Amino acid sequence: NLYTTTHLFKRHLAQYFCPMTASQQLTVAEIGVFHGHSTAVLAAVFHQVIAVDVEESYLRLASLQTNGSRNVVFLTGDSGADRWHAFRSNRIDAVVIDADHRYESVLADISNALSVKTVKHFAFHDYQAAGVRQAIAEFEERGALVNCQAIGSGWDGSAWYDGWNAETETKVSEGRLCRRGKLGNLAPSFVNKTFYVY
């Protein structure tokens, strides 16, 4: 099912983050929760989870999946709009991005996440979507995202979803896991900003 994360994706997230969270109290922002299956895993791994979705109904479902975990905060909002100012005043160590898969939206989500200086780790779902791949590739080329690795189904280059095209989608995994790189060559984000010209 392309609409939710696979067990392998969730296992790879846990394997990556558990060693870090064993010695530190880390916070993750999950952007796009759908039914909350990944949210439940993140709640078991992280000290604090901030789950954001534009659909209130998805947040209600996610709340049921997490069985009322006290370490999960649910927020309704459009992650593409620059409402990350609230996050900038908090310590967020990791971001899981699985919201709107259009190129411009993923670009905005990554830019907004990079504006939170404490974010060191990025996980992306639906890497098979062209907009997701293109946006991540641009940040990798700039050096803003480094040490990226494939996670979830297809991490080994195997076919894993209906519609998989062996000629154009070799080595396309379900997700991608990256670390923050040097940001010296990143231009500021002007997505969803208002300008007045006089």
What do these predicted ranges mean?
Residues 1-96, 100-198:
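A short alpha-helical cap/connector motif
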